Amino acid sequence: MKNSQAVTSLTWWSVVVAYIVSTNSRLYIGWFGVLLFPLIAVSTVAYVAAFILAPPVDIDGIREPVSGSLLYSNNIITGAVIPSSNAIGVHFYPVWEAISNNEWLYNGGTYQFVVLHFLAAVLAWLGREYEYSFRLGMRPWIYLAFSAPVVAASAVFVVYPIGQGSFSDGMPLGISGTFNFMLVFQAEHNILMHPFHILGVSAVFGGSLFSAMHGSLVTSSLLSETASYDSLNAGYVFGQEDETYAISAAHGYFGRLLFQYGSFNNSRSLHFFLAAWPVIGIWCTAIGVSTMAFNLNGLNFNQSLLDSSGHVVNSWADVVNRADLGMEVMHERNTHNFPLDLA
């Protein structure tokens, strides 16, 4: 009897394991997926509930709560999950650390709950990509590419609040909250003049340009496999071994149009470049945010130009600095009267 139960139990577990690691399923689960799906479900439900229902949060720790939910007079644009209170700092603040659920909500415990579960889910997705690639015998470039947004999110939601000493400095989880975070970040750290941020911007915009160029070149040089009155697409099947476009013709065109040495005649080199450019740039952005988290800020050229009499000749850097002062004065206006860190 015991042997029969053991065999039944073993068979049941074998079926579960086979389903989890199967690469033939419509949706690959994987061992990391066992973590991923519950985590992303919990964080999504908590986020939606907080966005709709959460009471105001004492974000600055001065007993002046800020509302972020739809129930408290916000809309889709102004709504957000408000970061944890400055009174909590960088302490881990699960619900059992508060005296009551009302206190936990008042101090913004929902923010930590959503952010930490979401980041854990994103890391599980990263691991799932590696696991799936490994089981298919693929190299781990997809996993490596996705590491860029993972480290960027980690820099914004974890490293920056830790460096600043409080989760209240984290990015609010909403549309206007994101823009508010960006403006305050510029005011306090001059991110526009940080070399790593400049690299990140060139990567994102450059990557968009290169992708558009590549796509237009490919679709303009498809090899015709059909009669003139049939669709060009009818001559191809998914996964075919033959080339679908003439790379030499496409990049010969590009080389003559713009720059001879800016074109590729090797498909692998081309696609590696298209992947590496934005990934490396976003890595640089994450490094930049992480350094500014500890106040290693952007370059400062304020009042750097003087005339022969020693008077300041205002430059664009001084205009930006004046704007930064204005944004900093408006930020946390009830907490301080003037930004001493920029005075």
From Swiss-Prot:
Keywords: Calcium, Chlorophyll, Chloroplast, Chromophore, Electron transport, Herbicide resistance, Iron, Magnesium, Manganese, Membrane, Metal-binding, Oxidoreductase, Photosynthesis, Photosystem II, Plastid, Thylakoid, Transmembrane, Transmembrane helix, Transport. A quinone binds at residues 214, 263-264. Gene3D superfamilies: Photosystem II protein D1-like (1.20.85.10). It is found in: Plastid, Chloroplast thylakoid membrane. Fe cation binds at residues 214, 271. Signal peptide: none annotated. [CaMn4O5] cluster binds at residues 169, 188, 331-332, 341, 343. One of its GO terms (molecular function) is chlorophyll binding. The record marks 160 as: Tyrosine radical intermediate. It is a multi-pass membrane protein. Pheophytin a binds at residue 125. Its EC number is 1.10.3.9. Chlorophyll a ChlzD1 binds at residue 117. Disulfide bonds: none annotated. The D1/D2 heterodimer binds P680, chlorophylls that are the primary electron donor of PSII, and subsequent electron acceptors. It shares a non-heme iron and each subunit binds pheophytin, quinone, additional chlorophylls, carotenoids and lipids. D1 provides most of the ligands for the Mn4-Ca-O5 cluster of the oxygen-evolving complex (OEC). There is also a Cl(-1) ion associated with D1 and D2, which is required for oxygen evolution. The PSII complex binds additional chlorophylls, carotenoids and specific lipids. Its main location: plastid. One of its GO terms (cellular component) is photosystem II. The keyword Transmembrane helix applies. Tyr-160 forms a radical intermediate that is referred to as redox-active TyrZ, YZ or Y-Z. It catalyses: 2 a plastoquinone + 4 hnu + 2 H2O = 2 a plastoquinol + O2. The chain crosses the membrane at residues 28-45, 117-132, 141-155, 196-217, 273-287. PSII is composed of 1 copy each of membrane proteins PsbA, PsbB, PsbC, PsbD, PsbE, PsbF, PsbH, PsbI, PsbJ, PsbK, PsbL, PsbM, PsbT, PsbX, PsbY, PsbZ, Psb30/Ycf12, at least 3 peripheral proteins of the oxygen-evolving complex and a large number of cofactors. It forms dimeric complexes. Photosystem II (PSII) is a light-driven water:plastoquinone oxidoreductase that uses light energy to abstract electrons from H(2)O, generating O(2) and a proton gradient subsequently used for ATP formation. It consists of a core antenna complex that captures photons, and an electron transfer chain that converts photonic excitation into a charge separation. The D1/D2 (PsbA/PsbD) reaction center heterodimer binds P680, the primary electron donor of PSII as well as several subsequent electron acceptors. Belongs to the reaction center PufL/M/PsbA/D family. This is Photosystem II protein D1. It comes from Prorocentrum micans (Red tide dinoflagellate). The gene is psbA.
